[in-house]
Design a protein with these regions (language model features):
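Generic N-terminal targeting/processing segments that precede catalytic cores or assembly contacts
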Residues: 1-161, 165-167, 364
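A structural signal for small-residue-enriched, beta-sheet-centric alpha/beta enzyme cores
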Residues: 3-6, 13, 167-173, 178-197, ...
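Surface-exposed flexible segments
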Residues: 85, 224-227, 361-367
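Bulky hydrophobic/aromatic packing residues
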Residues: 42, 190, 194-199, 364, ...
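Short acidic, gly/pro-rich beta-turn/loop elements at beta-sheet edges
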Residues: 109, 158-160, 221, 266, ...
């Protein structure tokens, strides 16, 4: 893929997601069926607004179906899926579009994830696949339907080296991606970007620092909090590094706002929230629930949850949610205060799309008021 980004002065090549691969393979197979000519390349629009030109690795027509494949290209940010073959078998049907997973595609066995009970092909890739075959159908004046089965040879073996089995996705990998594009960014480049943004805010005269974890946080702030977003700094998973930089640059107070699915880890003092670094979310919630008086059956069920929202629902049903979240807030602030050695006020707000604001650490309300006055004054 000939698209590049620059990170810390380094030119890095972008790649495309497994979702884009599945959509491209599906498009190639549908085109081969409808035209009788297997394509060598396909053009695929992505949610990012970028049209990809993806080579087709293989294509075979057999009667009423075709099987095509593409090779995953992760660019200069390769992961475990880089170089894998993503296949799609497309069969013509009377009407409608059905999408399923075959060999090497996991099945979602637990609630709370995208596509529960179905193949682990997430919502955006499913939409991309459906749009791709619909477009070629319109071009070829075809009015029937498609049955599409996505597969990844060796996907089951690959999945054993991921978090899929632990998350309740069994038998293979997931087809994922929200933009269709993989933009490479090394950890050091991310931290450098965070430090640069913090330094800029300090040089602009900001005395307070509002850290967000990403797009979810910023969307939530826009809807629910009294802050101007142009002064926020996104720290992604790197809460610890962002706090260290804030102290270095002399910020007088720090507030962190993020989804509880990440931020619950603060209750165990985990300052890098990437899943590859540490988890501990359910362990934290079990501890908070225990201290809040939740019954043993509820606590056992929490240990089996995949998502924090599912665990929160259990605590709510047990009548222990409010107290559990209060305890989580105190634990999180204890570790945050230890991180800054109590040198500046620091607090956090944790939310979920389903439940709204769940946690305000003890210092949070005061920080919200002070930062709101500074940012909006």
């Amino acid at each position: 893929m000939d698209r590049f980004v620059y990170k810390s002065g380094e030119k890095l090549r972008c790649g495309y997601t497994t979702g884009s691969c599945a959509a491209a393979a599906s498009l190639a197979a549908a085109e081969a069926l409808l035209t009788g000519a297997p394509p060598e390349r396909v053009e695929l629009p992505t949610p990012k607004g970028i049209t990809l030109d993806i080579p087709v690795a293989g294509c075979r027509i057999s009667g009423n179906s075709a099987l095509c494949s593409v090779i995953k290209d992760s660019g200069d940010d390769p992961d475990i899926t880089n170089g894998i073959e993503v296949c799609a078998r497309v069969e013509l049907t009377e009407a409608g579009i059905s999408i399923d997973g075959g060999e090497g595609i996991g099945r979602v066995t637990k609630p709370g994830l995208d596509q529960p009970g179905a193949a682990a092909i997430n919502s955006v890739p499913r939409k991309m696949i459906a749009a791709a075959v619909s477009d070629i159908a319109e071009t070829c004046d075809y009015h029937g339907g498609f049955r599409i089965v996505v597969s990844v040879p060796n996907g089951a073996e690959l999945a054993s080296r991921t978090y899929n089995p632990r998350m309740g996705i069994e038998g293979g990998i997931s087809i994922i991606g929200t933009t269709g594009i993989v933009e490479p960014m090394s950890n050091s480049a991310l931290v450098d970007t965070i430090r640069l943004e913090e330094r800029m805010r300090r040089e602009e005269g900001c005395r307070s620092l509002l850290l967000t974890l990403g797009n979810y946080s910023q969307s939530f702030i826009q809807r629910n909090m009294p802050f101007a977003l142009d002064r926020c700094v996104t720290c992604s998973n790197f809460i610890g590094e962002a706090i260290e930089a804030a102290l270095e640059y002399g910020f007088e107070r720090i507030l962190i706002i993020g989804h509880i699915g990440k931020m619950a880890k603060l209750g165990a003092g985990i300052m890098n929230t990437h899943s590859a670094q540490a988890d501990g979310r359910m362990e934290v919630l079990v501890t908070c629930g225990l201290l809040a008086g939740a019954d043993v059956d509820t606590l056992k069920k929490i240990t089996e949850c995949v998502t924090v929202d599912a665990a929160v629902s259990l605590l709510q049903d047990a009548g222990a949610l409010e107290k559990s979240m209060e305890i989580l807030g105190k634990r999180a602030e204890y570790y945050l205060a230890a991180k800054v050695k109590s040198s500046v006020p620091i607090g956090a707000v944790m939310f979920s799309d389903k439940f709204g604001i769940l946690v305000r650490t003890p210092s949070a309300d005061g920080l919200i008021e002070r930062i709101s006055e500074e940012y909006n004054g």
